[in-house]
Amino acid sequence: MQVGIVGKPNAGKSTFFSAATLTVVAIANYPFTTIKPNRGISYLRTRCVCRELGVQDQPKNSRCVDGERFIPVELIDCPGLVPGASTGRGLGNQFLDDLRKADALIHIIDASGSTDSEGKPSAAGAHNPVEDIGFLEKELEAWILQILLKDWDKVSRKTGLTSEEAVETMAERLSGLGVKKFQVEDALKLAGLRGKPSEWSREDLGRVVGFLRRAAKPMLIAANKIDLPSSKENVTRIGQNGSLTVPVSAEAELALRRAVEKGLISYRPGDPDFSVNASARLTPEQRAGLEMIRKQVLAPEGATGVQECINSAFFKLLDMIVVYPVEDPERWTDHSGNVLPDAILIRKGSTLKELALRIHTDLGERMLYGVNARNGMRLGDSYVLSSGDIVSVVSAS
């Protein structure tokens, strides 16, 4: 699963991406060795089951800090988007190509209203940031509709083409965007389309695309620059749009992570506050800057919002849960004796069989049954996983 960071120029998109991917929690032996220039690794933060079990864990694919698991996830930094991107304006084509790979989107909005629709600086509060949400949605839908409409008249007028065959055609055309057949079926129902596909108008298909965009590219709004005075009222207006909205100060998060990197403060992404290290020698400017972050961001908002955006994208938009596969269900270890070695993200509603196949194809294909490591109960391959499950898979040798 990958999440795309999107937004117009100067909204703080690059700052958000830099803050989210500046590692302050060391992860040893993580399998990614190279990341493309516009790719980065960030981390989900979730309560680890080690405290509940009263054990000292030894994570391999993630890190546990004071009972909090930090699980690596991949972010895509999409180029800044301006109106007309769907027709190739600006870096539109590159943006849309990157977007194909994203399963969900975090839309960075300049909540202060100090940049116009193309990202050019303006007076604070002069621009309505709600308009930025609408233009991005329209560009995405225009792009999807272009793909769908290619030769549509010819295809839809094909002798005897049924709505069921139209579903197959649409799903195949949009498969590169991550669109699934069931999503097309749902979108057609929501749009109220029945009968002959040849009778569906461009407006009809436009309604279908609107529902498909929400399903295939779910989006949350990061209302950035929350520390600026003109942002407060705008955040309320943005929230009334109906989208999942998180108040954010990407600049504050980046400053805090850089301070950690320099050994000046103790801070974990998502914390409500920081503490200055006893050995740190802060300049008056550094001390004033940190206090400003505390006063204008952390105290009123409870956090910078960056970590909440990452968590919400995966846990709310993509409906992911965390499970802990182990080899020894009695000691909660892998074959090397590491306690709770892996925290794996998987879709809510996934079965034990799907988890086994995810771990290794051979394990899934040879699976006999599973074991609930919390109580020793035997589990069938159709067992539906819950967040926090600790499970062992038994397979034929």
Q: Can you describe what each PLM-predicted range is?
A:
Residues 1-161, 172-174, 214, 218:
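Conserved G1/Walker A P-loop phosphate-binding module
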Residues 1-6, 11, 17, 152-389, ...:
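C-terminal-of-GTPase-core extension/linker across diverse P-loop GTPases
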